[in-house]
Curated annotation (Swiss-Prot):
InterPro entries: 4Fe4S_Fe-S-bd, 4Fe4S_Fe_S_CS, NADH_quinone_OxRdtase_chainI, NDHI. One of its GO terms (cellular component) is chloroplast thylakoid membrane. One of its GO terms (biological process) is photosynthesis, light reaction. Its EC number is 7.1.1.-. This is NAD(P)H-quinone oxidoreductase subunit I, chloroplastic. Its cofactor is [4Fe-4S] cluster. It is found in: Plastid, Chloroplast thylakoid membrane. [4Fe-4S] cluster 2 binds at residues 74, 104, 107, 110. The keyword Membrane applies. It comes from Psilotum nudum (Whisk fern). Keywords: 4Fe-4S, Chloroplast, Iron, Iron-sulfur, Membrane, Metal-binding, NAD, NADP, Plastid, Plastoquinone, Quinone, Repeat, Thylakoid, Translocase. Binds 2 [4Fe-4S] clusters per subunit. NDH shuttles electrons from NAD(P)H:plastoquinone, via FMN and iron-sulfur (Fe-S) centers, to quinones in the photosynthetic chain and possibly in a chloroplast respiratory chain. The immediate electron acceptor for the enzyme in this species is believed to be plastoquinone. Couples the redox reaction to proton translocation, and thus conserves the redox energy in a proton gradient.
Length: 165
C-alpha cells in the first residue's frame, strides 16, 4: 500500500513537471508571436548593411604606391600587384592590381594596413556570378564605385532590423 502511494506521488510530480514545461514552451511561443517578422523578400527588399560591414573592396589606382603591404598582411596572399621599377626616379610604378573575390575571406587586413588608404570596404554584398572567373576583379572593376541600395527607387530598403547592426 505504501509503495503504491509513493508511485502515485511520483506520478503526480512528473505530471506537474510536464505541465510546467508545456506551459513554459507555450509562453515562449506567445512571446514570439508578438515580434515583427525578420524575413526579407530579397530581390525586392534589401537590408542596408551596418557601417562596419565588410563588403567588396574598392581600390583607388592613383593612390597606390605598390608597396605590397596588402599582399604581406593578407592571410592567403591574395592581392596580385604588378609593378615596374622606374630607375631614373628610383620609384615603383603600379601596372596592374587584382583581387579574386572567389578566394577572398573579407578579413579587411589589406584595408586596415594600407599606408595610403587606397583600399576601402564597401557595402556591396551582391557578388554572385555564374562563372567563378568573373569574380577576379582587376583595377578597373575594383575602382568602380558601389551601387547604393538607398538610391534605387525600385527597392525597398530595410534598416530597422536590429540584429544586423
Amino acid at each position: 500500500m505504501f509503495s503504491m502511494m509513493n508511485g502515485l506521488q511520483h506520478y503526480g510530480q512528473q505530471a506537474l513537471r510536464a505541465a510546467r514545461y508545456i506551459g513554459q514552451s507555450f509562453m515562449v511561443t506567445l512571446e514570439h508571436m508578438n515580434r515583427l517578422p525578420i524575413t526579407v523578400q530579397y530581390p525586392y527588399e534589401k537590408i542596408i548593411p551596418s557601417e562596419r560591414f565588410r563588403g567588396r573592396i574598392h581600390f583607388e589606382f592613383d593612390k597606390c604606391i605598390a608597396c605590397e603591404v596588402c599582399v604581406r598582411v593578407c592571410p592567403i596572399n591574395l592581392p596580385v600587384v604588378d609593378w615596374e621599377l622606374i630607375k631614373s626616379m628610383r620609384k615603383k610604378q603600379l601596372k596592374s592590381y587584382s583581387i579574386d573575390f572567389g578566394v577572398c575571406i573579407f578579413c579587411g587586413n589589406c584595408v586596415e594596413y594600407c599606408p595610403t588608404n587606397c583600399l576601402s570596404m564597401t557595402e556591396e554584398y551582391e557578388l554572385a556570378t555564374y562563372d567563378r572567373h568573373e569574380l577576379n576583379y582587376d583595377q578597373i572593376a575594383l575602382s568602380r564605385l558601389p551601387f547604393s541600395i538607398v538610391q534605387d527607387s525600385t527597392i525597398q530598403a530595410h534598416s530597422s532590423l536590429g540584429y544586423l547592426s
